[in-house]
Amino acid sequence: MQNELQTALFQAFDTLNLQRVKTFSVPPVTLCGPGSVSSCGQQAQTRGLKHLFVMADSFLHQAGMTAGLTRSLTVKGIAMTLWPCPVGEPCITDVCAAVAQLRESGCDGVIAFGGGSVLDAAKAVTLLVTNPDSTLAEMSETSVLQPRLPLIAIPTTAGTGSETTNVTVIIDAVSGRKQVLAHASLMPDVAILDAALTEGVPSHVTAMTGIDALTHAIEAYSALNATPFTDSLAIGAIAMIGKSLPKAVGYGHDLAARESMLLASCMAGMAFSSAGLGLCHAMAHQPGAALHIPHGLANAMLLPTVMEFNRMVCRERFSQIGRALRTKKSDDRDAINAVSELIAEVGIGKRLGDVGATSAHYGAWAQAALEDICLRSNPRTASLEQIVGLYAAAQ
């Protein structure tokens, strides 16, 4: 009897310990530096790939931006089938169309070349094509799935960090909501960070994607699942963004600033992929899907308000964020002010009312935010009424 009791106690302790275990994972290979896109063919060849399905931003392809990628594949004798991705955030109908084309072409791997929307779509495609009996809506982070197709991710904006995360966000065609799926299989095999590909990104897009990266870093640093690994990446990314984003927005051909932003975006992605995000993302997904506004802009409109809500449980962490942004002694309020000032400096200091949001939206949006997986790692619990109030405060 005593042995049974002892075993039960140890099992209980083991269960409690497992609940405290935190993970940290990054892609196996990350290449960076101007011109690094030329390494894509070698990376594909190393993995034994013969025919790649290239999902590329349609505008970038038309502008000739995929030429270097094409050359690197041709030199290695690797065939490619091009799939121009539609403009805007990925919808499940577009993803399913790409899956059908990939199956028909017989490709053995995928390259994603574009912004976060293209990368998210490609991640979903690689998973769905090898799991034909499952839908994204049915999948969860604990789903047992067949291995996805090999994936090489080449971001052309500095923001989502999708090239280094285990997350994809796809708009459901029926509900209009954003489906957020986190799964270990969604982590790309290779991330190629070539800052030269980001030089032509318009200033307003640079600003929005940059604030998205800042939001990733701040939420990862504040998250319940933060670890020393993710803390180092997140606070480093915050400092880099504070220094480099105004330069990248103001002078797009500043390659050093562009590269710094691309690295910061990647670091923030690594951080939140393990630590999680928070209430700002849970809330931002709703107006983004309903009003079709860019994700980075939605984050910019909500981040200071959500930080004020979380401040009571994040005082020391916010003080460190303030120091990272202002390079001087700061308190928690200074951090929120510094974030607001940076958002205004890069020209996207808008309110929800400016993009068509009204109080009639807030109840449904708040309910959807409560169901968003990003909320799980927020440092402070939020009720439906509190989230409605936060939307109203950002009006």
Swiss-Prot record:
Superkingdom to which the source organism belongs: Bacteria
One BP term from GO: ethanolamine catabolic process
Stored SUPFAM superfamilies: Dehydroquinate synthase-like
Record-listed E.C. numbers: 1.1.1.1
PANTHER family: ALCOHOL DEHYDROGENASE, ALCOHOL DEHYDROGENASE EUTG-RELATED
Stated family: Belongs to the iron-containing alcohol dehydrogenase family.
Annotated function: May act on the acetaldehyde produced from the degradation of ethanolamine, producing ethanol. Active on acetaldehyde and isobutyraldehyde in vitro. In vitro works equally well with NADH or NADPH.
Protein name: Probable alcohol dehydrogenase EutG
Organism of origin: Escherichia coli (strain K12)
Classification of source organism: Bacteria, Pseudomonadati, Pseudomonadota, Gammaproteobacteria, Enterobacterales
Gene that encodes it: eutG
